Every structure is written in C-alpha cells, then in structure tokens.
C-alpha cells in the first residue's frame, strides 16, 4: 500500500481500500460507501476506525467531492454524538440489515422527491437513528407525535423504519405495514431548519403531512395543526402492525389513578407506550401548574414510580431518551395526572 495510507490501523479498512483501488486506483462514490460498510461490518465504528476513515478522506487524490463530503460528515457527526472517545454501534441483526438498506440508498444518485434534502446527509443520519433512535428530534416543529411513533418503530423494527425512509425519498411515497404515506408537494419541497436533521423531517413530517386534513406540514409556524391526537397515534400503531393496542384519551382533563396501574402493566408486558401530556410537566418551574389540554407526546421509558412524595418516571422527548420527570421538586400524583391527557400502548411486531 502507498505510504499515504501508512497510518491506517484497521484491517477491515485496509482490505476495503485494496479492493477499491485494485482496478483503476480511483475512488468511486460507491466504493466509499463500501468502505463505510466495511468499517461497520462487525456492527461497531470505533474512534480508531474514524481516524482511519479521516486519513482516507484527507489523503485520497481521486475521491469525488460528493464522496469526501459524505465521509467527513459521517466522521463529524459520530464525534458530535458520541464524543472523540465514543463509538457508534449496531447491536442487532435487524439493525445491520437496516444498515444494508441504507448503504444501498447512499450509493444511488439524485435528490429523489425531496430536492431540498441532501441524499448523503439523510442516509448517514438514518444510520445513526437505527443505532440510536434516541437522537430523533422534531426541533421547533410540532410533530412530536410522529417522532414518538418513529422512535418506537426504529427501536422495534429498524428494518421497517429504514425501508420506509428510503422509499419516501426515492419514490415520494412509502408504506409502514398498512399505513400509506404520500406527503404533499409542499412537504416534499420544503427546506427544514438547519438545526433539524433532514432524516427526521423526511420521516416524521411526511407521516404527519400525509395524514393531516387541516394544514400541510410545510411551515414550522403551523404549530398545533401539525400535532397528533391519541386517535392518530392509535391508528398508526394498529396499521403498522402493533398488536393488543390499548388507548385512552381526554381532550380537556387529565386521567385518573387507575391509569397509572394500567400504564405500569403495559410497560411491564413489553408494550411500546406513548403518552400525550402537557409539556409544562417537563419543566421544574411549571410542572405543578394547572393545564387544560395536551400539547406534547413522549414515550414512556420506565415504570411510573409512586412514592410518598409523588411520582417519578423517565421518558423520551426531544432527543433525550432518559429524560427524568420531575425535573424540579416533587411532582404529586394529582399534578401528574392533571397533565396526562392520554396514552397508546401496543406490543411490537
């Protein structure tokens, strides 16, 4: 191997380099995707392998600009998410199968039906989400319902999540079980805020827009019109293939103590549980305030612990998979239930 590759330590990456350069000494975009695939072959992308990939990106004289940008984005985002000493992992066969779907997507050309979304950024962000769905984030857009549903989908069936997202991008429509998602032109041609992942916009905004009879989800100012009811989420659960789906909702008043028993039972049975709450519950200075409607959707990540002081639980919300409630002092059971407006629970497929 040429001396410019002398610093590369990973046998996997060295082998992939030899294959890529064996024919014409040039790096095609597809060969760079294969390099990423090789690095993920054992399901782990280590800090050392990231350093090796950076050597390739910085020293190759024949790598196309698109491929170099994609590779550097992968390196940058991995370090942003996991730190310089952290590593990205795909721990299950389902996750690795989903990664194969995404690598195939990365090899293709063009912007598909979403001209404002870069294919390679979408693909790399999808890779991160099948390995760690907790990074999903709706940013300022009121699509917490779809994000909560897709968090569950990516956790329970990463293959289904990956296929859904790449089909959306390439075909302008996709299926999740019996859900047919066909977003409007306004949604497909919208440029989301730079602070939001294009993968999250693609998957979540399309789901909400396709099902929204009120407004197109093509403007972050839409707000409440983009939010999802318990009925919407229950329908997604059932049509996606979740079984033993149970739901309860109240538009203007909270639930009652028996619902905590039911939620803990569903959690213990391994069901995916989504809660519709008022977001004031999530902040120390407002958690005990009276509210009159739900305005946010979170995923229950722990049993609801009852103590003499009040309740304690963990939820997924806004890219935080282990968000503790309460954030301030004690949250009484009464105040918790007063901010809980519904739930959906179902067994993963």
Where are these regions (language model features)?
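Low-complexity, glycine/serine/proline-rich disordered segments
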Residues: 1-4, 55, 59-109
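Acidic, glycine-anchored loop motifs typical of Ca2+
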Residues: 6-37, 41-48, 54-55, 60-69
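Surface-exposed polar/charged interaction patches
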Residues: 19-24, 38-41, 56-63, 77-84, ...
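Extracytoplasmic/periplasmic, Sec-exported soluble proteins
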Residues: 27, 45, 136-141, 225
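Stable alpha-helical elements in mature extracytoplasmic
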Residues: 31, 49, 140, 145-149, ...
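Active-site nucleophile-adjacent alpha helix/oxyanion-hole segment immediately C-terminal to the catalytic cysteine
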Residues: 83-219, 244-245, 260-276, 308-311, ...
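Hydrophobic, aromatic-enriched interface-forming segments
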Residues: 217-257, 261
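Active-site signature of cysteine proteases
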Residues: 243-349
């Amino acid at each position: 191997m040429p001396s410019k590759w002398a610093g590369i330590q990973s046998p996997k990456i060295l082998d992939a380099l030899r294959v890529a350069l064996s024919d014409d000494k040039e790096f095609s975009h597809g060969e760079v995707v294969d390099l990423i695939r090789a690095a993920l072959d054992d399901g782990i992308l280590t800090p050392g392998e990231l350093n090796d990939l950076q050597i390739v990106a910085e020293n190759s004289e024949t790598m196309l600009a698109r491929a170099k940008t994609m590779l550097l984005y992968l390196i940058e985002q991995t370090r942003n998410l996991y730190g310089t000493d952290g590593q990205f992992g795909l721990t299950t066969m389902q996750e690795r199968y989903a990664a194969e779907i995404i690598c195939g997507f990365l090899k293709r050309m063009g912007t598909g039906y979403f001209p404002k979304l870069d294919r390679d950024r979408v693909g790399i962000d999808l890779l991160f989400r099948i390995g760690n769905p907790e990074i999903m984030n709706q940013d300022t857009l009121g699509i917490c319902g779809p994000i909560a549903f897709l968090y569950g989908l990516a956790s329970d069936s990463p293959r289904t999540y990956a296929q859904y997202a790449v089909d959306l991008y390439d075909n302008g429509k996709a299926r999740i079980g019996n859900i047919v998602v066909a977003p409007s032109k306004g949604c497909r041609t919208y440029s989301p805020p730079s602070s939001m992942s294009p993968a999250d916009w693609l998957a979540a905004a399309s789901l909400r827009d396709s099902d929204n009879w009120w407004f197109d989800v093509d403007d972050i100012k839409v707000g409440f019109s983009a939010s999802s009811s318990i009925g919407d989420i229950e329908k997604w659960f059932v049509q996606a293939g979740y079984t033993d789906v149970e739901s309860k909702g109240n538009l203007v008043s909270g639930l009652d103590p028996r619902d905590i028993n039911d939620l803990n039972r569903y959690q213990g049975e391994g069901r995916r549980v989504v809660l519709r709450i008022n977001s004031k519950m999530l902040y120390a200075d407002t958690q005990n305030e009276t509210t009159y409607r739900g305005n946010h959707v979170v995923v229950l990540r722990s049993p609801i612990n009852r103590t003499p002081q009040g309740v304690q639980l963990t939820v997924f919300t806004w890219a935080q998979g282990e968000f503790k409630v309460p954030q301030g002092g004690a949250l009484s059971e009464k105040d918790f239930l007063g901010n809980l407006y519904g739930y959906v629970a179902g067994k993963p497929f």
